[in-house]
Design a protein with these regions (language model features):
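N-terminal periplasmic accessory domains that precede
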Residues: 82-87, 132-135, 154-155, 170-173, ...
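Structural signature of Gram-negative outer-membrane beta-barrels, strongest in the C-terminal barrel
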Residues: 300-301, 398-404, 408-410, 441-573, ...
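C-terminal beta-signal and adjacent terminal beta-strands/loops
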Residues: 675-677, 698-759
């Protein structure tokens, strides 16, 4: 009996033993330490808060609760003395969410001085998880057109809408790796959505640290594995028009290292003729904590893509048979075949509580073989770069000062060759046939960025943000094909461009926060745009320059049940680049005008009280776009006062989310897009249209380790005929009508299942 009592006493004492623990608490999506995070010991009720580096230490009896505004509360079991890394998952309430201020100075979104939108993992997974445009188009001020899965164009506040092909004038990054090439063009639609934990969009030229593109900055945050967590998942889905998708993901997290590998396979037969799509992607992220002062992280991704190009249609073909390909593009069986890889390694060194250094080495390669009716393009590109910055924190007479200082070097080595396409010399069905060489250009497209940014907190109400950015871009073109009698060789060094910004954030009360900023931005011409028709550099070409003026308010009421923001802005752009085509594949640019981008953006979110049945969330956002040509003369035509081409006058999104206590969930999104000018003369407009998308599903945890998610969804439920992308200012060659319109998908459905196993 005495032995039994003794054993009982020992066990009782052990169950209440105190453990000396320490650690750091970080954001699960950004890996940024969380300041002022609350840790409570359940038994003793003792509590402690993390410091500015997210660190803490205290005595615990067995179990702690970790909480912070904007994050899901987490419970952690303690059974020994140890150093912990604890990850918190951001909640939907975006005003409280921690963000990386353009990946430079961590700050809560409500205290940002610019208009910034955050798309978290739950919102990324809201649709079919293969298309990016439904995700971005729910953000006020952002409009992504999508001709096919491999042909897209993103505009932010009207900037980028007049680009002929793809996305330009917007800086994009995957982690710390630039997705924007030396020509200022970006292709983010090829990145696997399942590899993303977060998308951060800064509207306007307000990101000093990551370039000051006129439109703004898009930061794609890769999914990083939690330490001491291992899991595996498999997803498969099918949909209309031969859509098939498989995603496999394995993660392994130890005490000091983590590893995440994701593979995806995507296929679509396509809605149109010559519209097949195949993409395979492998994405790897890894991290190592060598000690308390140094961490290393790796991001790598390889993409193999082959997709048909049906191209745009004229009005008659769009109205009568939108599923056809443009005749010459279908006859030549045009396609693009891309191999694309990116790699980045980041070193994080903490010198002290006040100073931290972040240094990244990155590189990429891109090979593309692209037969078109007018020629066959074969191109290779290799990039290499380095970014380094130091983050400092100080307190000066009770005033909090945080600063960021650094630079970036970027080298882009490009080779593009074109060949005759002899498809017309062969029977229909043969497709493209490579002929004689037409051109061979080797290009070096390099730049450097120097940047500085600081946040000054004068008191709990008033904050200032100051930023400086210096850029210089260099082009070097070597023409390796002189048989055509044209030598396009030459160098073109743009003058250094200095871009300042100033921002302010003022807390009126617990419900209202004012913000505003003035920022300078620019966009350089591409190498093609700098060449005149005779093949020589245009010495008079200049970058587009703009100043953005903005003010807004962020609000929350009814205990955070209602929250949102309103922004008013004007962006004045001068030296507008106007593209002129001489033949189907030959165009150049001149500086020919000014534009005014005046707009209002509003967002309202409502979260209902959680009941035994579940919870409902509502949202509405709208963009009112008053974009015009201030001064614009092209040849003999004066377009001054016309509406800016390629941008709708208004966009509205309405949505509802249901999260049931019975494990069911559902969402519905309605989007209304106003009419869009298709040419600079404003003589052709794309009709307004409405889209209704929805998804329902069931997810449940089975025996603790297994989680299953089954869903079905539909896009364009109302089956509205619409043009999902426009070829602005199209010209009809050979007496043919201009081909302005890319048909959007009619009603289509998808469904799938995801199985997740967690150790």
């Amino acid at each position: 009996m005495k032995k039994i009592i003794l054993i009982f006493l020992i066990l009782s004492l052990n169950s209440y033993s105190q453990y000396n623990i320490s650690g750091v608490i970080v954001d699960n999506t950004t890996m940024i330490p969380i300041e002022n995070c609350k840790i409570i010991d359940i038994l003793s009720k003792a509590e402690v808060y993390t410091d500015s580096n997210g660190s803490f230490s205290f005595m615990s009896n067995n179990k702690i609760i970790v909480s912070s505004p904007g994050y899901e509360t987490k419970e952690v079991i303690i059974n020994r003395d140890e150093h912990l890394t604890i990850y918190l998952i951001p909640t939907i309430n975006k005003l409280e969410e921690i963000l990386v201020k353009a990946a430079s100075i961590p700050i809560e979104q409500k205290h940002a001085t610019d208009a910034v939108s955050i798309i978290n993992k739950k919102e990324i997974d809201r649709g079919n998880t293969i298309e990016l445009h439904p995700i971005l188009n729910k953000v006020a001020g952002v409009f992504m057109q999508h001709a096919t899965l491999n042909t897209n164009r993103i505009a932010i506040r009207g900037i980028g809408a007049r680009n002929l092909f793809g996305t330009a004038n917007i800086r994009t990054y995957f982690g710390d790796i630039p997705l924007t090439d030396g020509n200022g063009e970006s292709s983010i639609e090829d990145i696997e959505l399942a590899s993303l934990s977060k998308i951060e969009i800064h509207k306007g030229p307000s990101s000093s640290t990551y370039g000051v593109g006129l439109g703004g900055t898009i930061l794609l945050k890769p999914t990083l594995t939690n330490y001491q967590e291992s899991r595996a998942s498999l997803s498969t889905s099918v949909g209309s028009y031969g859509l098939r998708r498989t995603v496999a993901n394995v993660t392994k997290g130890g005490k000091k290292s983590n590893f995440n590998i994701l593979y995806s396979n995507n296929h679509s037969d396509g809605y149109r003729v010559n519209n097949t799509y195949d993409r395979n992607t492998v994405t790897i992220t890894a991290g190592v904590d060598t000690d308390n002062m140094n961490t290393f992280s790796i991001i790598a991704s390889y993409i193999n893509l082959k997709a048909g190009i049906p191209s745009s249609l004229n009005q008659e073909d769009f109205d009568t048979n939108p599923r056809q390909a443009a005749f010459t593009w279908g006859r030549s069986q045009a396609f693009e075949d891309i191999d694309y890889g990116i790699l980045g390694i980041t070193w994080n060194h903490q010198y002290s509580d006040k100073y931290t250094q972040y240094t990244s080495l990155f590189g990429s390669f891109r090979n593309n073989y692209e037969p078109r009716p007018f020629n066959i393009l074969s191109e290779r590109s290799n990039t290499l770069g380095i970014r380094s910055r130091i983050l400092g924190k100080h307190t000066i007479h009770t005033k909090e000062l945080t600063w960021n200082l650094g630079g970036e070097l970027f080298f882009d080595f490009y080779n593009g060759r074109t060949f005759d396409n002899l498809y017309q010399d062969f029977p229909p069905g043969t497709g493209s046939v490579q002929g004689n060489q037409l051109s061979d250009l080797q290009e070096k497209r390099n730049y450097y960025n120097l940047f500085a940014e600081t946040n000054l907190k004068l008191n709990n109400k008033l904050r200032f943000n100051l930023g400086l950015h210096l850029n210089q871009t260099f082009f070097d073109v070597n023409d390796q094909f002189l048989q055509d009698g044209i030598n396009s060789s030459g160098t073109f060094d743009f003058n250094p461009i200095f871009s300042p910004k100033i921002g302010i954030n003022y807390v009126i009360n617990s419900n209202l926060i004012l913000f505003g900023n003035i920022a300078h931005g620019f966009s350089t011409p591409t190498t093609t745009e700098t060449l005149l028709p005779e093949g020589v550099f245009n010495p008079d070409i200049k970058p587009e320059i703009g100043w953005n003026y903005e003010t807004g308010v962020r609000y929350k009421f009814l205990k955070n049940k209602i929250y949102g923001s309103i922004s008013l802005y004007t962006l004045r752009v001068r030296d507008l680049l106007v593209t002129r085509r001489t033949v189907e594949d030959n165009f150049f640019a001149i500086n020919a005008g000014k534009t005014n981008h005046n707009g209002i953006e509003g967002e309202i979110n409502y979260t209902s009280t959680k009941t035994n049945y579940g919870q409902l969330n509502f949202y509405i956002n709208t963009s009112l776009n008053m974009y015009t040509f201030d001064e614009f003369t092209d040849l003999e035509a004066d377009f001054s006062g016309n509406n800016l081409t390629g941008v709708p006058k208004n966009i509205m999104n309405l949505g509802i989310d249901l999260i049931s206590e019975k494990k069911f969930y559902a969402n519905l999104n309605f989007q209304a897009v106003g009419e869009i000018p298709v040419n600079d003369a404003n003589t052709v407009f794309n009709d307004p249209y409405e889209l209704l998308n929805g998804k329902i599903g069931y997810q449940n945890t089975i025996k603790k380790h297994w989680k299953c998610n089954v869903y079905i969804g539909a896009n364009n439920i109302l089956d509205k005929k619409h043009a999902s992308q426009l070829q602005i200012n199209a010209i009809g060659f050979g007496g043919n009508a201009p081909r302005y319109f890319y048909p959007g998908l009619p009603f289509n459905i998808y469904g799938g299942i995801n199985i997740n196993y967690r150790l």
